[in-house]
From Swiss-Prot:
Annotated protein name in UniProt: Large ribosomal subunit protein uL1
HAMAP family registered for this protein in UniProt: Ribosomal_uL1_B
Function: Binds directly to 23S rRNA. The L1 stalk is quite mobile in the ribosome, and is involved in E site tRNA release. Protein L1 is also a translational repressor protein, it controls the translation of the L11 operon by binding to its mRNA.
The organism's taxonomic lineage, starting at the top: Bacteria, Pseudomonadati, Pseudomonadota, Gammaproteobacteria, Pasteurellales
GO cellular component, one term: cytosolic large ribosomal subunit
Keyword Ion transport tagged: no
Signal peptide range: none
Amino acid sequence: MAKLTKKMKAIKAGVDSTKAYEINEAIAVLKQFATAKFVESVDVAVNLGIDPRKSDQNVRGATVLPHGTGRTARVAVFTQGANAEAAKAAGADLVGMEDLAEQIKKGEMNFDVVIASPDAMRVVGQLGQVLGPRGLMPNPKVGTVTPNVAEAVKNAKSGQIRYRNDKNGIIHTTIGKADFAPEQLKDNLVALLAALNKAKPTTAKGIFIKKVSISTTMGAGVAVDQASL
């Protein structure tokens, strides 16, 4: 078992793993230990009251955070004609059809999000083995297959996050950077939880959001008292 560094020992000593912290206190604890030489991301893990083995209980979607994530996504769009011009005007970094598909087949994937208009899926469908494992395959459930590609580009550029539960029923995503103001992080977390509650499967019974923990890239998880949100 790897030895803990002095920093990790200090973090673990400073975080009470048995306690659910009031949100402002939780953020203060995170910021106290966010001492890396780069600006750390603030990540969240949300334990859901679902059975991930059942397809009708899986949770997947997207939402735009009010204060963004602290980084600007590079967006590739599969579309043509007037939609291509609209996508470029909205800020898309790459726009094309077969030509863009060829770039991707060659391994040129300098983008974070892929969006497609419905008529372009005949081209995108050929890229499933490349885009799928990377979580980049366009999907109507998260708004990345849409006739309104310009709006989708604007959402991606303005801090939209996509979420999907893992095999343990946990959502992992980012809600900002460690240098965000506490209120910005709180607003983003509240927006995410509201989106998750809206996406609750009708077949899920009992408590839906069971536990919320936030952490920085190099830090320990801090449980959040949901009553403080």
